[in-house]
Amino acid sequence: MSTSSHSGDCTAVPSNSNGTIILSAIGVVFGDIGTSPLYTLKEAFSPNYGLTPNHDTVLGILSLIFWAMMLVVTIKYVAVIMRVDNDGEGGIMALTALTQRTMPFGSRSIYIVGILGIFGTSLFFGDGVITPAISVLSAVEGLEVAEPHMKAFVVPITLAVLILLFLCQRFGTERVGKTFGPITLLWFIAIGVVGVYNIAQAPEVLHAINPSWGLHFFLEHGWHSMFVLGAVVLAVTGGEALYADMGHFGAKAIRHAWMYVVLPMLALNYLGQGALVLSNPTAIGNPFYQSIPDWGLYPMIALATAAAVIASQALITGSYSLSSQAMQLGYIPRMNVRHTSQSTIGQIYVPTVNWTLLTLVILTVIGFGDSTSMASAYGVAVTGTMMITTVLMIIYARANPRVPRLMLWMMAIVFIAVDGAFFYANIIKFMDGAWFPLLLGVVIFTFMRTWLRGRKLLHEEMRKDGINLDNFLPGLMLAPPVKVPGTAVFLTADSTVVPHALMHNLKHNKVLHERNVFLTVKTLKIPYAANSERLKIEPISNGFYRVHIRFGFMETPDVPSALMCSKDHAGIDFDPMHTTFFVSRETVIPSANRGMPIWRDKLFVLMHRNAAPANAFFRIPGNRLVELGAQVEI
């Protein structure tokens, strides 16, 4: 398993035990794709596609589902993309940062790759809204099969489960998380056993493993078969999680879990549902629950709901983690991040993200009303993210001379053709619900781009009005102000310019501390900064130091802890009780005559005003912080 050092520690943290890592991976990584049998085959034969559940059509759809799992998950993700890691970390943001590192500094390509990464991240957040909604709703819809009169209660029960899930987030998942693996493993075993039971009733369904049935389906239905791919892709939703969670569990554990547990059980269940439909075509209304014996229906509903909650939890936790990475890389404003575990670094809770997701999930459930309507919206976010991941992987592989060119272009053609077909099959359902995740993606993309552009304009304005630090200090020492005991740490984004906070301190307080540190915090495009690279201390003149602290994008920046290591690096001993942190708090004034359009200026001002204060984000004690204001027009 990938390990790291604590954000500010001087020593590394030992590796976590990997004794139960495969079981843990089953619980976290495969919850989303594991609940896909609840709705995939049901959606493929919904009235939206006009298919008749006859022998050839059922085998054709099953063949497409099986080979979608093989091509997209087994070959693309497990065999190829999971070989590309950013110091052990995966996911679209890690891949974006890794790809940008292969490009010349300041090149246009870095900007284009950044745009792709931001939009892929935006679509992932859209996925984080739809997955909890469709997973829990599909599980609870089993009540309609058991008791048809319960249909009116499906949406209220779904909302109750989801609201309770989000309300519990602030307590963390350290204790209950230990049950995720066993429960999800039980889920996979149960659906596999049910699949075997139904296959025994119609064993000819096993012929669907032959890809010729999928090809026959395409030949028979022509262009109409492209529409059906919009339902088939539901079988691979959650495939991106294999790559995104690679840093938590390691590629080997995820590969073993997929090949030996998840893939066989999913295949058995899909084939079992198909066998049921071959024997009883009327079961196509809800083949998953219809395939279960009456005595096991209620236990399966309970188990399915638990599996759906776990799948939702994985997406929620992933949204927190992705938000934290985006904050570190400067894509979104700083937000309050709470750590919910004293023993596990990565377990965090982001209240703003939590309540935003809950609001959107509630609106999604109420707006769509059932899983069939929601399925039309689900695929766009998933296929869009998958396609962007493929493009980024190809761009990265092009820069790697060890990758044979012929193999690279063959992979590019196959993967882009498959991803493109799935994306097209979903985008043509724009008016049927595909607009929803695209709208979410565009809104989030706009926020992220506005924040990036606004921060750049803000830094340019402050630098333009700034004074060169190396020229300023000699003049200051010609008529030095009164010195007071202790250390002053001035946080600054540009270490070559005099911090606004220092200028205001001299102007209003007319004092200087014995030791003055100009501190710049930098986030690297790698997950974790090595301890040897954490601190860079440069003495400028007597009593003045320029300090750079580096954190990886997966780390929580703990500035005081990092500074405590300075004695080991340069003999500077930071005493927290005698150190004062000075931060400049800018008041941004929008202007119609420069920078961005005025509406984006106002949006940036709103985000900047609501960003978490620096002391909370950098874990600086509030009683050691002095904030000094400055007005900046952009």
Curated annotation (Swiss-Prot):
Cite the entry's keywords alphabetically: Cell inner membrane, Cell membrane, Ion transport, Membrane, Potassium, Potassium transport, Symport, Transmembrane, Transmembrane helix, Transport
User: What are the TM regions of this chain, as residue ranges?
Assistant: 21-41, 61-81, 110-130, 148-168, 180-200, 217-237, 258-278, 296-316, 348-368, 377-397, 408-428, 432-452
Q: Where in the cell is it found?
A: Cell inner membrane
Check the UniProt entry and state the signal peptide residues, or none.
none
Q: What is its main location?
A: membrane
How does the record classify its membrane topology?
Multi-pass membrane protein
Q: Does the keyword Transport apply?
A: yes
Q: Name one GO molecular function term.
A: potassium ion transmembrane transporter activity
Q: Give a yes or no for keyword Zinc in this entry.
A: no
* Catalyzed reactions: K(+)(in) + H(+)(in) = K(+)(out) + H(+)(out)
Pfam families registered for this protein in UniProt: K_trans (PF02705), K_trans_C (PF22776)
Which HAMAP family does the UniProt record give?
Answer: Kup
Task: Explain the purpose of this protein.
Answer: Transport of potassium into the cell. Likely operates as a K(+):H(+) symporter.
Family according to the record: Belongs to the HAK/KUP transporter (TC 2.A.72) family.
What name does this protein carry? Probable potassium transport system protein Kup
Gene label: kup
